[in-house]
Amino acid sequence: MQLNAKANKKKKNHLKIIKVVDGDGLIVENIFNNQEFEIRFLGIDAPELKPCRKLIQDERETHLAAQFLMELGRKSLKYLLEIAPPNTNVSILVETENEIDLYGRTLAYVFLEDGSCLNEIMIQEGFAKPYS
């Protein structure tokens, strides 16, 4: 996965995963001030877990049944829980011009302590697709 070389970025360290929401979303906490916020993985899209407008759109685009897509969403969530369960320490990299989405979530590249990027892993392992 290539980061946008032109975008200004800032790094946030000292975060701990509180909850894995789905295959491309987390709730994290700053370990110093206990501030919690939701992260949406930047540049990827994992299958949905429940019926919604996005699921209908994905069903139309992929020609796959909603139930099958939601099963893929559950597998994506399960995999992310295996590699980054609650209490895992992470850091994030955000593009300053594209930091918050319409739902108030922080858009970010998420990194484990060993430097591996969760966004990239989810794509490489087939649990998400690139999204722009």
Model-derived regions: residue spans:
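Small beta-barrel nucleic-acid-binding modules, primarily SNase/OB-fold domains
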Residues: 1-132
